Amino acid sequence: MRLLNIVSSPRGARSASIAVARAFVDAYRQTGATIDVDTLNVWEEDLPDFDSGAIGAKYKGVANAPMDEAEQSIWRRIQSLVKRFQDADRIVVGVPMWNFGYPYKLKQLIDLVSQRNMLFTFDGNAYAPLLEIPRALVIHVRGQSREPGAGADNPGFRHQADYIEFWLRFIGVSEVRSLTVEHTWGARASDSIERAQARAVEMAAEF
């Protein structure tokens, strides 16, 4: 069993999303199956820029057209990242909320690996996923809550979760489970994170 653990917070030991994901992964290791954890930290990986060179390689790759040496180098790096998704049996993603969205490095990873004929297909009429991953867990972390009057009941607060969960289904994850962690700053942070870690342990048993 290969678990792809995507880390998108740069805060290390101070990160709520990393703390909750670690509790989940540690508990999942105790479920009896042999678990190989592949941790993909978007802040530590040497992610290539998705610039004109990468986009040029992308379109040549789709068209099976010859690439120059620089494009081949970028394309090999993209293929290496894609393979980590292709090899995964389960996915865990920790996503702190940044300005109602997600860390830009996570979006960079998504842009790099979301390649036609690698993670999805398109026949001119419809898209179809190429992965066959039974389930993923997304840990959504935000400092505010959806309590009445807190402001987080605005539909914009769903943007983060809707996008990440849609993308996972788009590439071939059958079931996307979510764990939302709120109040991750101030006096309530410690209790909120501990409750989320306890819930993560429970969820690991059925993952």
Curated annotation (Swiss-Prot):
Source organism, top-level taxon: Bacteria
InterPro entries: Flavodoxin_fold, Flavoprotein-like_sf, FMN-dep_NADH:Q_OxRdtase_AzoR1, NADH:quinone_OxRdtase_FMN_depd
Record: residues binding FMN: S9, S15, A16, S17, M97, W98, N99, F100
GO MF annotation terms: electron transfer activity; FMN binding; oxidoreductase activity, acting on NAD(P)H as acceptor; oxidoreductase activity, acting on NAD(P)H, quinone or similar compound as acceptor
Cofactor (UniProt): FMN
EC number: 1.6.5.-, 1.7.1.17
Annotated cofactor note: Binds 1 FMN per subunit.
Transmembrane region(s): none
Keywords: Flavoprotein, FMN, NAD, Oxidoreductase
Keyword set includes Acetylation: no
Reactions it catalyzes: 2 a quinone + NADH + H(+) = 2 a 1,4-benzosemiquinone + NAD(+); N,N-dimethyl-1,4-phenylenediamine + anthranilate + 2 NAD(+) = 2-(4-dimethylaminophenyl)diazenylbenzoate + 2 NADH + 2 H(+)
Function: Quinone reductase that provides resistance to thiol-specific stress caused by electrophilic quinones. Also exhibits azoreductase activity. Catalyzes the reductive cleavage of the azo bond in aromatic azo compounds to the corresponding amines.
Record text on subunit structure and interactions: Homodimer.
Membership in a protein family: Belongs to the azoreductase type 1 family.
HAMAP family with a match to the protein in the record: Azoreductase_type1 (MF_01216)
Protein name per its UniProtKB record: FMN-dependent NADH:quinone oxidoreductase 2
Organism this protein belongs to: Burkholderia lata (strain ATCC 17760 / DSM 23089 / LMG 22485 / NCIMB 9086 / R18194 / 383)
Gene that encodes the chain: azoR2
